């Protein structure tokens, strides 16, 4: 028998081998467990499926966009996206019918013959048309050529297609006979019947022209004015930019570049753009100047003197064209004066004013006061009780008669005022307990504040459109995770006709899943914040996912945007598809909540809602174990680009990767109206510092620890690229590694495929820890129009 010790000696090499093999197996197992994820071109292609140009066409009968017809019957047509194309439908509320607006097949056939092209019933070459007065024919334009077809489709004939007033940069008079436009800094009028043109003003010169809105980031030759109802007068202004500082951009090309210069006042500038209000009488013509000092180039809404059209905001004519009401806004947006002018003499009467400690707003996108000379009243919107409420003033005395709306929640838009019935129709948010406070609802209330009625009952976000008479409205309602339903309602909210219900079958078949709404607590631990979460469609709760914040900090809007249904919200779902959790959170300092909520970071723009973003993301990680909070990223554009870089500098241990595009990184280099409203007037102290120093990202760049990609268009005339270059310079001086992409001759948006791909690559490489497919190529396609657009 072999001694035990010898047996052990002989077995030792085999034991060592077994240990080595076992150890190697364990190492291999550990390496497999920690192996970086693999991201392929197929993964990118799958993610691309969830970009808007792929998802939008998959939603059929998405919503109703009514084109109302003349008359009291409330008839309207809309265009609907259907299987394999689109069709036009005509709604008759009196008959309670919904039928084809014309014979699609026959119109397609006769038009094909007349135009020498090939069309079919669901692929007609137009998206808009007008009925003839008798309703027997339709007129439309195809590639600049006018056509008229009878609704039965028996004939189609080519017609002259006059250039649209908008294309000519004109504003047509209410009676449809005249069009006003700018020529060489003066206003001219054109007779639409005779084409005869004549000047209305002659003293306009460079930097002191009429009706122009070329101030700061706004550059347009569209005249800003308001015709009187009787088409005899025009309310406008002479804009004074003499001595105002300029902004400069240089294009990129072979040979000598072109220098682009325009007036662009900045915070703290002694001389900024002002306007001198005038009324132009077409008889003569003659110009009546209002007898007041020049007004600031300001309005009661975000950062311009006009809304989404060329109409001048904060100006209203009386129905008889004898009186002109307007609001003068101080440079710091803290003081508003309601005034009424005599357009014949230029005399101005100050009726009442309002002062606030931060900034005044009368709405989002459109001013929400109403001039009611027929009843000697003014409807005024104010946040004096911490919510956007309506108030009724006496037009003769300027005294407050009564508060119209009360309680929590905001009036966001006055959509109709019925002086005869003494009723106000308005869009409100946050007024229904237990519902998302961002959901819009339509309400009706009496001038005296009594009989408040909810007209859109569904627990959803309501996108409404009233008929010209106000007797009907189209109600499109949905939620981020619930498809759209469209109905026609009477003025009292009663349903008249069911119109459409969105069909998501194609979208769902493509793998789409809705975002997940959530709530978290704000920085104060008390206030509820609302957001959306996007997960990979192949989500596995046993895995750990990095989290990415898609941010827009406001202050004029938030990260989430619409609370209605959308097949795509930027590239949030597409990015999530690569192996991330993507979130959007509306933090404190964004609108549509209380005034206190909106004022949260007034005077401290560097805040950018970041304390709320960090707090919210941490809460989500505690709630959901599949979120890896140690791998947090952030991205955004414009204000979101500003916030992204700020996040990387102010929270360097939390945010590991950021992609910042087109950021206004130092608001001293962004237009005056924006910054002076949200940060306050620039105040320089005796020691050389100012109240704007801390908001400047370059002053915090030395704190960078993570991976940061900066991008900007070199011809960005909204946020000039020097904002990003200030940060670049600071990072270089601090010896920090970073990445930079400049887009030659590009403007502000940077929504092109190359930027999307670079953003995806950056997060995949630095946050996910994988190597992205090399130079993946997107294949965008034109977005098919949605129903009614």
Where are these regions (language model features)?
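Serine-hydrolase catalytic core recognition
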Residues: 246, 292, 312-313, 321, ...
